[in-house]
């Protein structure tokens, strides 16, 4: 019990959570009952040795399956976070989904901030595998949201159709989406929407709850790439993130639909700056300005984001730790995309290719979603600059191929950026 209340208090500057003694007694009774249920289930599992519970991962191709061993599983299986989240809950999405046709997935999620410490013996090697060798035990994350440092941020708009930068943020003291209760999810919505109401100028806007939105309006926002898709992704469904859908989910956007915040999808929040065309520097400037203001407004209300110097910003999927940043463009590459050197060029530039509609889609009319592969080991400014330089290189290659000229595979980028 002390651990649970400690987590809640850690996320608040104020102790107003326990203002009403009567409701406090009811809350205490409810939490005790919930913990008793979890404890009973957990004790039942201990009747079997860990070897009897070890998942069959022989046909799997994800980071978790590569890193998990019977010894690690035996050591961690019976551990729980203060919120009652287990190793098996962390890895279930990777057990249920052996691999992905387009990208290599992580194969596990965190249920709360403490998951990354309690189950560090599996999370650390997974993080190292996913993030190009970043070691969370010996390295520190560096944050830099100074958009003035960006250079050459205007793309050739004959090729680049749109530009986008996004990140995620989690509210400290509340469980992450795989483990959150309805009450916690609604609290996330309340905290974030209340804070967003304080945005001014070109950032001011309105919140649209999915609960009150028609199917037609939802689909239109999805088709226009403003709103997250319906919960059909295996990551969401197998990890328990689609529970109670669409309760306490929604989208906030400014009047121009160039600054958006998703609430309670894969993460507590996703903060997005986007616009048509190729002005990535302007997109990133708005992103930095808006994100800083959102954090200020969150703190003003007694909350804070999950962060530590080793992991950076803490999010549900280990792939989004560190900056949580994905800077991407929709770019037309009809010739380069058919060149056998294309995958190696992307690899050396530390870029990732997705289909036109995202990770689970194919390219339409040779339009690809190109973004940074890394999230850790480099700052936000460094990652956006990598995308700018890399996409400009891809466009130059496309132009050369149009003229019948040869192209070269660039040398690989250094493993990490600023120390």
UniProtKB/Swiss-Prot annotation:
Catalytic activity field: creatine + ATP = N-phosphocreatine + ADP + H(+)
UniProt keywords (A-Z) are:
ATP-binding, Kinase, Membrane, Mitochondrion, Mitochondrion inner membrane, Nucleotide-binding, Transferase, Transit peptide
Highest taxon of the lineage: Eukaryota
* Membrane topology qualifier: Peripheral membrane protein
Q: In what residue span(s) does the Phosphagen kinase N-terminal domain sit?
A: 46-132
Q: Where in the cell is it found?
A: Mitochondrion inner membrane
A Pfam family recorded for this sequence: ATP-gua_PtransN
Entry keyword Transit peptide = yes
PROSITE patterns given in the database record: PHOSPHAGEN_KINASE, PHOSPHAGEN_KINASE_C, PHOSPHAGEN_KINASE_N
Summarize tissue expression: Expressed in the leg muscle and heart.
The UniProt entry, under InterPro entries, shows:
ATP-guanido_PTrfase, ATP-guanido_PTrfase_AS, ATP-guanido_PTrfase_cat, ATP-guanido_PTrfase_N, ATP-guanido_PTrfase_N_sf, Gln_synth/guanido_kin_cat_dom
Assigned EC number: 2.7.3.2
Targeting signal (transit peptide) range: 1-39
Question: What is the additional note?
Answer: Mitochondrial creatine kinase binds cardiolipin.
Physiological role = Reversibly catalyzes the transfer of phosphate between ATP and various phosphogens (e.g. creatine phosphate). Creatine kinase isoenzymes play a central role in energy transduction in tissues with large, fluctuating energy demands, such as skeletal muscle, heart, brain and spermatozoa.
Q: Which family does it belong to?
A: Belongs to the ATP:guanido phosphotransferase family.
Q: Which PANTHER family match?
A: ARGININE OR CREATINE KINASE (PTHR11547), CREATINE KINASE S-TYPE, MITOCHONDRIAL (PTHR11547:SF19)
Q: What is this protein called?
A: Creatine kinase S-type, mitochondrial
Q: Which organism is it from?
A: Gallus gallus
What lineage does UniProt assign to this protein's organism?
A: Eukaryota, Metazoa, Chordata, Craniata, Vertebrata
What gene codes for this chain? CKMT2
């Amino acid at each position: 019990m002390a651990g649970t209340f400690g987590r809640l208090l850690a996320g608040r500057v104020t102790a107003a959570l326990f203002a009403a003694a009567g409701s406090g007694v009811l809350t205490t009774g409810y939490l005790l009952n919930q913990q008793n249920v979890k404890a009973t289930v957990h004790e039942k599992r201990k009747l079997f040795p860990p070897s009897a519970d070890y998942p069959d991962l022989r046909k799997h191709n994800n980071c978790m399956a590569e890193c998990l061993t019977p010894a690690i599983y035996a050591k961690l299986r019976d551990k729980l976070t203060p919120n009652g989240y287990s190793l098996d809950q962390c890895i279930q999405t990777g057990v249920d989904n052996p691999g992905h046709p387009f990208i290599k997935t992580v194969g596990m999620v965190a249920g709360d901030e403490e998951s990354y410490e309690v189950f560090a013996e599996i999370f650390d090697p997974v993080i190292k595998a996913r993030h190009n060798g970043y070691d969370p035990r010996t390295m520190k994350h560096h944050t830099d949201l100074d958009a003035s440092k960006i250079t050459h941020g205007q793309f050739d708009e004959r090729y680049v159709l749109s530009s986008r930068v996004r990140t995620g943020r989690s509210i400290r003291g509340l469980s992450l989406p795989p483990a959150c209760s309805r009450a916690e999810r609604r609290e996330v919505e309340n905290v974030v929407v209340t804070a967003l109401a304080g945005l001014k100028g070109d950032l001011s806007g309105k919140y649209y709850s999915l609960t009150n939105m028609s199917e037609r309006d939802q689909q239109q926002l999805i088709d226009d790439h403003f709103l997250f898709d319906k919960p059909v992704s295996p990551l969401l469904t197998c990890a328990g993130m689609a529970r109670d859908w669409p309760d306490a989910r929604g989208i906030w956007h400014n009047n121009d639909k160039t600054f958006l915040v998703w609430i309670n999808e894969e993460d507590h929040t996703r903060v997005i700056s986007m616009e048509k065309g190729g002005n990535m520097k302007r997109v990133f400037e708005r992103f930095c300005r808006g994100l800083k203001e959102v954090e200020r407004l969150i703190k003003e209300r007694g909350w804070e984001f999950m962060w530590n110097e080793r992991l950076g910003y803490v999010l549900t999927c280990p792939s989004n730790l560190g900056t949580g940043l994905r800077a991407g463009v929709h770019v037309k590459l009809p010739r380069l995309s058919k060149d056998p050197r294309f995958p190696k060029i992307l690899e050396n530039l530390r870029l990732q290719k997705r289909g036109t509609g995202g990770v689970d889609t194919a390219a339409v009319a040779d339009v690809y979603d190109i973004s940074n592969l890394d999230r850790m080991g480099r700052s936000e400014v460094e990652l956006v600059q990598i995308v700018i330089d890399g996409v400009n290189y891809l466009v130059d290659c496309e132009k050369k191929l149009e003229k019948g000229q040869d192209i070269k595979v660039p040398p690989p980028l250094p493993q990490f950026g600023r120390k």
